Amino acid sequence: MKKQHDTIIVLDFGSQYNQLIARRIREFGVYSELHPHTITAEEIKAMNPKGIIFSGGPNSVYGEGALHCDEKIFELGLPIFGICYGMQLMTQHFGGKVERANHREYGKAVLKVENESKLYANLPEEQVVWMSHGDLVTGLPEGFVVDATSESCPIAGMSNEAKNLYGVQFHPEVRHSEHGNDLIKNFVFGVCGCSEGWNMENFIEVELEKIRETVGDKKVLCALSGGVDSSVVAVLIHKAIGDQLTCIFVDHGLLRKGEAEGVMKTFSEGFHMNVIKVDAKDRFMDKLKGVEDPEQKRKIIGNEFIYVFDDEASKLQGMDFLAQGTLYTDIVESGTATAQTIKSHHNVGGLPEDMQFKLIEPLNTLFKDEVRVLGSELGIPDEIVWRQPFPGPGLGIRVLGEITEEKLEIVRESDAILREEIIKAGLDREIWQYFTALPGMRSVGVMGDERTYDYTVGIRAVTSIDGMTADWARIPWDVLEKISVRIVNEVKHVNRIVYDVTSKPPATIEWE
């Protein structure tokens, strides 16, 4: 029997941070779902949530193409918390004034609490918050009071406690807001009255039921790569429908060292799944020959991947569904109906229009760290659960520019050395993701008294909670030295190593 739990609904107005809001709430043990701003009041009412959060967004509430919501949502009597654009939308709805700011405010600011509403209960009077806005609330709606101010924002927070309506001009969901979690927690528990009750055990129960209802007696193909996401998808679906699942492992020649052999051993022998291995290396390399543009590479790899599945499915009987390990972060990085696109993601951007399968994506409401917890709950070994995140296009987007066998081998061997040394140093759980990339640039060097003109290998290592934001990892110098010396000595055609010290934003984690 499905367990009941309190729910907070988040309405998406296009912020790149909107997924983080739901993520923060789940960290509190309360279920949260993201829905498009076009959802109706009746649909929300049917979900019986305890409260609603309006996300931020890049638009102006008074501008052309401004995003709005069903005005009846304000009549549901539910607590509403507007963040940035969400606060401005609330202001506009209730007759307040929103104007263009003299200067766009982006970055850290000091917030001063002027009125201790429930939102600011037990929080410091001054705190650092993260601002990202071009508009300001300059006139309060009737019945609202100013909760907080900042140097550049006279109305940085407002509330109408009689109606349980709250708004902030900053982003509490971003970790740069030092008490942001506590503020959201105050809304979820203090204002909405939620109770903890959602966890991975609940998620598994709900998803197993959903998979069985969706699939019925039909069959599912799973795109198994051996990475964390596809592994968890495969085990979850196998747990739900058993032998109705067939896993197809496509070796596209863009995998890490030893990965192909490891996948077959773990899933075919260890989990007793039906796994079909397809050697498609030549097919992929032919399609990628001469292609340098990263977006084109992603599309080609995504398309070819599905076509391989089509070919294999035609040999099987009655395959209706294709399972993918799409995550929340995959979707936000590819752009939703409202979010501005950062890059086409390998799981959601490269699908051909004539695809013959219906997609089943049981992880598309989870973040990477949640997927690891789910994997452990499902009994998947740590060496798989804590495996490095690996993109669908594989090493294809870690070789910048045209892909060749020589370049792939350089990345494959250097990446294996990096992983080996990071594990030896005991840093594999501290660093969220680490890999090598080949930027395609050559430089002059000296090896054995001879001049060389060889490739540079870039090392990328980041710390993160959920992949939405990331900081470059402070790997100890002695460990970096070992990695550098080994790669230059053991990998052919490499004479220089560089370390990427850029956070996300402004950079993405992958180089392409």
Curated annotation (Swiss-Prot):
The active site is at C84 (nucleophile), H171, E173. Its EC number is 6.3.5.2. Keywords: ATP-binding, Glutamine amidotransferase, GMP biosynthesis, Ligase, Nucleotide-binding, Purine biosynthesis. One of its GO terms (molecular function) is ATP binding. ATP binds at S225, G226, G227, V228, D229, S230, S231. Pathway: Purine metabolism; GMP biosynthesis; GMP from XMP (L-Gln route): step 1/1. The keyword ATP-binding applies. GO terms for cellular component: cytosol. InterPro entries: Class_I_gatase-like (IPR029062), GATASE (IPR017926), GMP_synth_C (IPR001674), GMP_synth_GATase (IPR004739), GMP_synthase (IPR022955), GMPS_ATP_PPase_dom (IPR025777), NAD/GMP_synthase (IPR022310), Rossmann-like_a/b/a_fold (IPR014729). Residues 7-197 form the Glutamine amidotransferase type-1 domain. Residues 198-387 form the GMPS ATP-PPase domain. It catalyses: XMP + L-glutamine + ATP + H2O = GMP + L-glutamate + AMP + diphosphate + 2 H(+). The keyword ATP-binding applies. Pfam families: GATase, GMP_synt_C, NAD_synthase. Disulfide bonds: none annotated. Homodimer. Catalyzes the synthesis of GMP from XMP. This is GMP synthase [glutamine-hydrolyzing]. It comes from Bacillus cereus (strain B4264).
